[in-house]
Regions:
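Metallo-beta-lactamase
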Residues: 2, 6, 11-12, 18-121, 125-129, 133, ...
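Active-site environment of divalent metal-dependent phosphoester hydrolases
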Residues: 35, 58, 142-149, 173, ...
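Active-site metal-binding loops of divalent metal-dependent hydrolases
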Residues: 52-53, 107-110, 142, 169-170, ...
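A short acidic, glycine-rich active-site loop
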Residues: 76-87, 128, 260-273
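Short acidic loop-to-beta-strand element that houses the catalytic metal-binding Asp/Glu
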Residues: 93-95, 228-231
């Protein structure tokens, strides 16, 4: 059983998020999700950003950034061109055609988050992609907005022919969650979910070369026990998908040391972000974010005011 004491911030923050999605807390609800897709290239691979939905969180010192004044957070958001009173997080899995393989990185929220998410199937259809064609799914971590789309509304496998890659530590953690604990992480009917996907799951160790020359796991600790990013492709056109190591295209990049409420280990999460921003600026690494503004592909660059997110120009 998962020890709640190891993840106090994550339990509280995600519980608050789910309450707000259910309309328990005051404030305007995020708009209903719409299907959307954006093709781009990763070297010779064809990739597609797939919109699943989006989440909004208030600037209140507890829902996302903790330990900073609301005024300080608002000032950073405003300086970065974002709304000063709330955070906007997109949800966008990534699909990649690599030779005969069709790779899907995370699966969105499925039915877990109501009508603000769960549009991955529609986005795939609009992009001309078929769930049955997906050969491999790579899970960054086991929160509802990343694994909810693994199953359909009836509990069947949404991608019946896909091997599901997830880190050994993350799989162990997910498999050990009680129903009540799982709800705090945005997961409903966790036992049924685990049972459905178990025959397809292939756990891996941190840093594993999963598909040689195509996908390599990159450990990015702090958010969940076995949180993993993925390097896709090789050479200068490769892309690093970093999961939930960063959430906000403004705050996570400009203030990576600021701690996040729903990181299981908030200090490790901050350390990971600091290193990720620093290495990305130095290397010019292309990045894919599942929560930055759609379509989530770009780089982190250094300017006179510090680091900032530079979306890739796609035509």
């Amino acid at each position: 059983m998962t020890d709640r004491r190891r993840f106090p911030g994550a339990f509280a923050a995600i519980s608050a998020l789910l309450m707000s999605l259910a309309g328990v807390t005051a404030g305007a609800a995020p708009p209903a999700a719409v299907a959307q897709f954006q093709p781009f290239k990763i070297g010779s691979y064809s990739a597609v950003a797939l919109k699943d939905g989006g989440i909004e969180e208030p600037v209140d010192g507890k829902s996302f950034i903790v330990g900073q004044s609301n005024e300080e957070v608002a000032a950073v958001l405003k300086a970065g061109g974002a709304p000063a009173d709330h955070f906007e997080f997109s949800i966008q899995p990534l699909l990649v055609h690599a030779g005969v393989r069709v790779l899907l990185f995370d699966t969105g929220a499925g039915g877990f988050f109501g009508d603000i998410a769960g549009k991955l199937p529609e986005s795939m259809k609009e992009a001309g992609e078929k769930p049955a064609s997906v050969t491999d799914i790579f899970i960054s971590h086991a929160h509802g907005d990343h694994i909810g789309g693994l199953v359909t509304s009836t509990g069947a496998l949404a991608f019946p022919n896909a091997t599901i890659h997830i880190s050994t530590q993350e799989w162990k953690w997910l498999s050990g969650l009680s129903e009540d604990e799982a709800k705090n992480f945005g997961i409903h009917q966790v036992s049924a979910l685990v049972s459905a996907i178990k025959p397809k799951v292939v756990p891996f160790e941190p840093g594993a070369d999963l598909l040689k020359g195509i996908v390599k796991a990159v450990p990015l600790g702090g958010h969940t026990p076995g949180h993993s990013g993925y390097r896709i492709g090789s050479g200068p056109d490769s892309v690093l998908l970093f999961g939930d190591a960063m959430h906000s295209y403004v705050v996570s990049v400009r203030k990576p040391s600021w701690q996040v409420a729903f990181d299981g280990d908030q200090q490790l999460g901050a350390t990971t972000r600091i290193a990720l921003v620093k290495s990305s600026v130095a290397s010019g690494q292309r990045l894919y974010s599942e929560h930055f503004p759609f379509p989530g592909i770009g780089k982190i660059v250094k300017g006179k005011d510090g680091a900032s997110w530079q979306p890739e120009s796609l035509h």
